[in-house]
């Protein structure tokens, strides 16, 4: 089967090997006579799936032992409420606004905290650049500092996580890494909590990953629902309530796929990082030399995962999208809030897909310039 290239921002492409294995095991997982979707989450079959997935993820992301890995539900949007319900006892939380998702996080937190303080914002520049960390106005005694490390809509990415200690801040850093989790290594020495929906790089929608330092557990507000209390979830190995079993299974297969990846002598996440850099460089280099297309994001914070781009003559947008569909290049329309086009090139997107997109863009430019 010749599959098209899917540039969806999420739910996004899943590696074909993962889908094929899931299809083969759909009716009978490892001779159990059951589909994973039919298993009790407390049965030995699913417990083995869960434990393997957790161990593989800890290895892939080099998660230190003082961090708990939680498999939850609700997506990144729900975590915008769940995080302050768990961590905001001090009453003040700092937010760095770098795009739509960090804006949503601050707006949601205002329901639960006395002061959702905007420490810095890139809104004046239409979120085409990141506020320099040395310019952040961080609060004294804040419960935590929140960033979205990759903004899916605006295509802005922190190329490295900020070092709050170097900025004179003792608050833990909370990172929404939904759209680039497992695309590059994580410096856990700078992180207190990281969360993300699985539907971009790890599997299907419905599963949410939370990785939280143990000393941050046990501080939930009284109003926090027990199913969302990180300590309760951790104490029950993510099974206080029925977890998203199918999502955990597919994520586990994806973790195994990541472990098999190689690139220039590198393996796993390091291999994917090298591949992702090559994919992004290929695309940006073409757009930057073109007089027909434009990317508006500052070069030092361009996303490797989500690339918004615009035709200078927007009257040709519909023709561009129609031609792309004919070539098997799907879901390139930009988010409604910014317009234009967007190519999401997550881990599952092969470099051949980016090459095919660039070749189509070049041909379209030659026909219409």
UniProtKB/Swiss-Prot annotation:
Annotated L-glutamate binding sites: 42
Residue list for modification N6-(pyridoxal phosphate)lysine: 200
Coiled-coil region(s): none
Location in the cell: Cytoplasm
Catalysis: reaction(s): O-phospho-L-serine + 2-oxoglutarate = 3-phosphooxypyruvate + L-glutamate; 4-(phosphooxy)-L-threonine + 2-oxoglutarate = (R)-3-hydroxy-2-oxo-4-phosphooxybutanoate + L-glutamate
Sites where the protein binds pyridoxal 5'-phosphate: 101, 152, 176, 199, 241-242
Enzyme Commission number, as recorded: 2.6.1.52
Domain of life: Bacteria
Cofactor or coenzyme needed: pyridoxal 5'-phosphate
Comment on bound cofactor: Binds 1 pyridoxal phosphate per subunit.
Record-linked InterPro entries: Aminotrans_V_dom, Aminotrans_V_PyrdxlP_BS, Pser_aminoTfrase, PyrdxlP-dep_Trfase, PyrdxlP-dep_Trfase_major, PyrdxlP-dep_Trfase_small
GO biological process entries: L-serine biosynthetic process; pyridoxine biosynthetic process
Cross-referenced HAMAP family: SerC_aminotrans_5
Function: Catalyzes the reversible conversion of 3-phosphohydroxypyruvate to phosphoserine and of 3-hydroxy-2-oxo-4-phosphonooxybutanoate to phosphohydroxythreonine.
Protein's name in the database: Phosphoserine aminotransferase
Organism, scientific name: Delftia acidovorans (strain DSM 14801 / SPH-1)
């Amino acid at each position: 089967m010749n599959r098209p290239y899917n540039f969806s921002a999420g739910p996004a492409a899943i590696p074909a090997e993962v889908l094929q294995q899931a299809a083969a095991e759909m009716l009978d997982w490892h001779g159990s006579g059951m589909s994973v979707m039919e298993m009790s989450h407390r049965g030995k079959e699913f417990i083995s799936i869960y434990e393997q997935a957790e161990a593989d993820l800890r290895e892939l992301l080099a998660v230190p032992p003082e961090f708990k890995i939680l498999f939850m539900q609700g997506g990144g949007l729900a975590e915008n409420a769940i995080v302050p319900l768990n961590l905001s006892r001090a009453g003040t939380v700092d937010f760095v606004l770098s795009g739509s998702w960090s804006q949503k996080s601050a707006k949601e937190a205002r329901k639960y905290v006395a002061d959702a303080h905007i420490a810095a914002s890139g809104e004046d520049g239409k979120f085409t650049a990141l506020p320099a960390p040395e310019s952040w106005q961080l609060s004294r005694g804040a419960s935590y500092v929140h960033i979205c490390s990759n903004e899916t809509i605006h295509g802005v990415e922190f190329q490295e996580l900020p070092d709050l200690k170097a900025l004179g801040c003792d608050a833990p850093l909370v990172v929404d890494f939904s759209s680039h989790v497992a695309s590059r290594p994580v410096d856990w020495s700078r992180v207190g909590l990281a969360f993300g929906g699985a539907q971009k790089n790890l599997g299907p929608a419905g599963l949410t990953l939370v990785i939280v330092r143990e000393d941050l557990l046990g501080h939930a507000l009284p109003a926090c629902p027990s199913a969302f209390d990180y300590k309760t979830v951790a104490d029950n190995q993510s099974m206080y309530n029925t977890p998203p079993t199918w999502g955990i299974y597919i994520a586990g297969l994806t973790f195994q796929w990541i472990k098999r990846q190689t690139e220039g002598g590198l393996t796993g996440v390091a291999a994917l990082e090298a591949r992702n850099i090559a994919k992004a460089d290929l695309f940006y280099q073409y757009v930057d030399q073109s007089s027909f297309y434009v990317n508006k994001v500052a070069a030092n914070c361009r996303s490797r995962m989500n690339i918004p781009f615009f035709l200078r003559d927007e009257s040709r947008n519909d023709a561009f999208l129609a031609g792309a569909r004919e070539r098997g290049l799907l879901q390139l329309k930009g988010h409604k809030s910014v317009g234009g086009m967007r190519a999401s090139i997550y881990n599952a997107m092969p470099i051949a897909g980016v090459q095919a997109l660039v070749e189509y863009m070049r041909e379209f430019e030659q026909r219409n310039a």
